Amino acid sequence: MDRVTHFAVAAAKLAIEDAKLDMSKENPLRCGVCVGSGIGGIHTFLEQSLKLGSKGPSKISPFFIPMEIPNMSAGQIAIATGLKGPNTAIVTACATGTNCIGDALRTIQYGDADVMLAGGTEAAVSPIAIAGFANMKALSTNNENPEAASCPFDKKRDGFVMGEGAGVLVLEELEHAKARGAHIYAELAGFAMNCDAYHITAPDPTGETPAACIAAAVADAGVKPEEVDYINAHGTSTHRNDLGETIAFKKVFGEHAYELCISSNKSMIGHLLGAAGGVEAIATVMTIENDIIPPTINYKDKDLDDPEGPLDLDYVPNEARKKVVNVALSDNLGFGGHNASIVFKKYVD
């Protein structure tokens, strides 16, 4: 298995363990997987490409294709856990994890499964991926102070810092979860997705399309915009993303945007690309569970002078905050213009 699949299988097993899900008591045909990767097995791809150049095609591993393709993480999770229900892997760049969670939600709502493992995985910290992102000017160049290089919404932000890992949740139909006495962290209440149709990498500068996605997810959750307490933002620490997200939040929430708590996990763990949505969904759920909002660290200088609009919302700077959170939203944006948003609510029996 490629490193990306190792991450996925490990996260899936940990999720099952945490959920106390006994697969020997479940119908495997009613339990599925939706776990994707933005890039797939890039370590395998690089290794085999170098071997092709140095030793020729006869030396390429017969496992190259199965190890490289992005859907193999979902397949290997099923093999490792025995889940025989719906099995898919969505690829929408950095929106992958959120899209997978949303698709898993719909799978349960449509009645095609009772349990879904959902999220994203990525292992792209490799020379070729770093070079590619660096040459397109997406990465921070603050090499003198790397601990502070990821600084979402800060005036001095200059690009993201790459991270890697996997985040997988157990989504379960409510009555099924109650019947087995599962601990319910939160209710996944809403999902929406759309596309900017604007540029291969840059987000919609008007914020209109991501705003529409966020608004649709909030509506799907059956809540009013003013009921949202917290947003786990995409917050990549790039100029365009953080500005565009702020504009979108203001469009959706109006004056309530200034009462929202907004933070970016990427300030602490970097940008996990296709895994970002999975890990950030878990952080959002734990925010609701514990009523503690994670901070945006490395936030020092407010960006109030941008000609396209000030970044003047509450980004929960530098210290976690104790606050009751009943409704929270997590949003992610991906190259290609992909937008995806999910809404969680505090579960009340």
Region roles according to the model:
Residues 52-63, 80-90, 147-155, 195, ...:
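Glycine/charged-rich beta-loop-alpha catalytic/anionic-binding loops adjacent to active sites
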Residues 112-158, 191-205, 235-242, 259-313:
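Acyl-CoA/ACP chain-elongation machinery
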Residues 27-28, 221-227, 258, 311-349:
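Flexible, low-complexity linker/loop segments at domain and module junctions
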Residues 144-221, 229-230, 349:
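Condensing-enzyme catalytic core mediating Claisen C-C bond formation in acyl metabolism
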Residues 43-57, 107-110, 130-143, 205-208, ...:
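A glycine- and small-aliphatic-rich helix-loop capping segment at beta-alpha/alpha-beta transitions
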Residues 1-92, 121-130, 225-241:
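Conserved beta-ketoacyl condensing-enzyme motif
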Residues 8-21, 70-74, 78-81, 86-122, ...:
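Active-site-proximal alpha-helical scaffold in enzymes
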Residues 12, 33, 77, 97, ...:
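Conserved small-residue
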